[in-house]
């Protein structure tokens, strides 16, 4: 019997050792699963934070470009009066040679002025046949046999814009 007892104790010892190994393995698996879950959560948080940071960076860059594009708007709007005066001077009829020379100088100044405005994003609103309230300001309505209702009959004052923003609408008369 003592051999059987010895054998039984050996089996119990092996089973106990085997159970301890299994328990240890289960504990390691549980810990590894917990660590993997923690890692996955942290990785997800990192990815979201990184994506949010990139979105903020893009939005700030867009706002910066927009601010730069429209920073000169007020200044450019004030310069339009000077532009109108130069254009009026160029349109004056001249009879003598001195007046023609002065007119030529004013024209050169006007051309240079227009190039500088264009360089800084100020553009003339192109003539539109059809009245567009986003681009035009109707000063009055006129009867016209040559124009359909809603068509621009005459441009009274040129309009300008910076990028897509109108800084001064084109003042027009519109056919009834």
UniProtKB/Swiss-Prot annotation:
GO terms for molecular function: adenyl-nucleotide exchange factor activity; protein homodimerization activity; protein-folding chaperone binding; unfolded protein binding. GO terms for cellular component: cytosol. It comes from the Bacteria. Keywords: Chaperone, Cytoplasm, Stress response. It is found in: Cytoplasm. Disulfide bonds: none annotated. The keyword Zinc-finger does not apply. Residues 1-28 are annotated as: Disordered. Pfam families: GrpE (PF01025). InterPro entries: GrpE, GrpE_coiled_coil, GrpE_head. Its main location: cytoplasm. PROSITE patterns: GRPE (PS01071). One of its GO terms (biological process) is protein folding. SUPFAM superfamilies: Coiled-coil domain of nucleotide exchange factor GrpE, Head domain of nucleotide exchange factor GrpE. Belongs to the GrpE family. Homodimer. Participates actively in the response to hyperosmotic and heat shock by preventing the aggregation of stress-denatured proteins, in association with DnaK and GrpE. It is the nucleotide exchange factor for DnaK and may function as a thermosensor. Unfolded proteins bind initially to DnaJ; upon interaction with the DnaJ-bound protein, DnaK hydrolyzes its bound ATP, resulting in the formation of a stable complex. GrpE releases ADP from DnaK; ATP binding to DnaK triggers the release of the substrate protein, thus completing the reaction cycle. This is Protein GrpE. It comes from Campylobacter jejuni subsp. jejuni serotype O:2 (strain ATCC 700819 / NCTC 11168).
């Amino acid at each position: 019997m003592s051999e059987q007892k010895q054998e039984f104790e050996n089996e119990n010892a092996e089973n106990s050792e085997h159970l301890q190994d299994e328990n240890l393995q289960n504990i390691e698996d549980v810990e590894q699963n917990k660590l993997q879950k923690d890692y996955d959560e942290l990785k997800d948080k990192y990815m979201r934070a990184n994506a949010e940071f990139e979105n903020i960076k893009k939005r700030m860059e867009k706002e910066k470009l927009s601010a730069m594009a429209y920073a000169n708007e007020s200044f450019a709007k004030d310069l339009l009066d000077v532009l109108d005066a130069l254009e009026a001077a160029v349109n004056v009829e001249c009879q003598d040679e001195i007046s023609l020379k002065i007119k030529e100088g004013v024209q050169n100044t006007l051309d240079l002025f227009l190039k500088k405005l264009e360089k800084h994003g100020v553009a003339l609103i192109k003539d539109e046949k059809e009245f567009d309230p986003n681009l035009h300001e109707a000063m009055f309505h006129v009867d016209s046999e040559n124009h359909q209702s809603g068509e621009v009959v005459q441009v009274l004052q040129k309009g300008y814009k910076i990028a897509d923003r109108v800084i001064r609408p084109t003042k027009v008369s519109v056919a009834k």
